[in-house]
């Protein structure tokens, strides 16, 4: 009997509505406070369960990533090892999110793989345990697994649900790849922002502690920020390179997008406090 394809598992992008770096731990990781919100712009994954433990990935990406570095295959393998599952999967990735953009695409792909295969393999591993598996793959993976907008502390794994407004965003994608590792290793990165309560942070102006450093080193990011500020309050997400502006109405965001310089790319997407992945999981 041939297993059916399970289609259309979304791996949504996220925005860091603010990002504060509070210090550096002895293990090299950074303490931070950040506010994650999903947007309705996604990669998509399809899965076919196999009756052996083989894992195979197909992708529309032009750049080939080695299997041992690919977060999707690492996620599937981690789930197999954790559960002792004797099934495998053939996976198709429709990559739509930019790489190295601060939108969390790789982490989101890994999270969708864990959530989908947990369901398709019939493992029924609780979400909190699944998030622990995901944390070993990357600090941003748990928020995608939990599936709600969240205030995050620690290295990003301590999550508290929040429900900020869900506006429309214009996301500008500069033609540059920013290395998260290089930014966090840069001695010029601010690491002493005081910690504040969530209530205080929600009432204060939002900022990204990485933005000034990235803009200094990446003229493309600085140019995108300067252009977007003409139309809306704008910030960088994560360690960049993507920047976003907030709009009340979809048409306002689309009107700004229509004026985007030809040297830049961008898209319009709605904020979402519940991940599209959770809506897909509910269909199973």
Swiss-Prot record:
GO molecular function, one term: ATP binding
Protein role: Catalyzes the phosphorylation of the position 2 hydroxy group of 4-diphosphocytidyl-2C-methyl-D-erythritol.
Organism: Shewanella piezotolerans (strain WP3 / JCM 13877)
Catalytic activity reported: 4-CDP-2-C-methyl-D-erythritol + ATP = 4-CDP-2-C-methyl-D-erythritol 2-phosphate + ADP + H(+)
Keywords, ordered alphabetically: ATP-binding, Isoprene biosynthesis, Kinase, Nucleotide-binding, Transferase
UniProt pathway: Isoprenoid biosynthesis; isopentenyl diphosphate biosynthesis via DXP pathway; isopentenyl diphosphate from 1-deoxy-D-xylulose 5-phosphate: step 3/6
Binding site for ATP: 98-108
Disulfide bonds: none
Active site annotation, chain numbering: 14, 140
A biological-process GO annotation: isopentenyl diphosphate biosynthetic process, methylerythritol 4-phosphate pathway
Gene3D superfamilies: 3.30.230.10, GHMP kinase, C-terminal domain (3.30.70.890)
Protein name as annotated: 4-diphosphocytidyl-2-C-methyl-D-erythritol kinase
Matching InterPro entries: GHMP_kinase_C_dom, GHMP_kinase_C_sf, GHMP_kinase_N_dom, IspE, Ribosomal_Su5_D2-typ_SF, Ribsml_uS5_D2-typ_fold_subgr
Cross-referenced Pfam families: GHMP_kinases_C, GHMP_kinases_N
Recorded family membership: Belongs to the GHMP kinase family. IspE subfamily.
Keyword Transferase: yes
EC numbers, comma separated: 2.7.1.148
């Amino acid at each position: 009997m041939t297993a059916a394809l399970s289609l259309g598992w979304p791996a949504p992008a996220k925005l860091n509505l603010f990002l504060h770096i509070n210090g550096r731990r002895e293990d090299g990781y950074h303490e931070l406070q950040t506010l994650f919100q999903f947007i309705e712009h996604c990669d998509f994954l399809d899965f076919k369960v196999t009756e052996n433990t083989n894992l195979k990935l197909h992708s529309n990406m032009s750049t080939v990533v080695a299997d041992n570095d690919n977060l999707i295959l690492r996620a599937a393998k981690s789930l197999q090892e954790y559960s002792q599952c004797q099934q495998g999967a053939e996976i198709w990735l429709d990559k739509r999110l930019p790489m190295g953009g601060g939108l969390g695409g790789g982490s989101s792909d890994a999270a969708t793989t864990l959530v989908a295969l947990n369901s398709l393999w019939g493992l029924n591993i609780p979400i909190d345990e699944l998030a622990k598996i995901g944390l070993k793959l990357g600090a941003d993976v748990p928020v995608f697994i939990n599936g709600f907008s969240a205030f995050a502390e620690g290295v990003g794994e301590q999550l508290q649900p929040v429900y900020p407004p869900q506006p429309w965003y214009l996301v500008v994608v500069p033609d540059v790849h920013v290395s998260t590792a290089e930014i966090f290793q840069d001695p010029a990165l601010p690491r002493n922002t005081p910690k504040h309560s969530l209530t205080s942070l929600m009432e204060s102006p939002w900022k990204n502690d990485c933005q000034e450093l990235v803009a200094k080193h990446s003229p493309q990011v600085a140019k995108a920020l300067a252009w977007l500020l003409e139309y809306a309050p704008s910030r960088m997400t994560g360690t960049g390179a993507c920047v976003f502006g907030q709009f009340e109405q979809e048409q306002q965001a689309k009107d700004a997008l229509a004026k985007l310089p030809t040297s830049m790319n961008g898209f319009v997407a709605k904020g979402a406090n519940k991940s599209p992945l959770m809506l897909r999981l509910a269909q199973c």
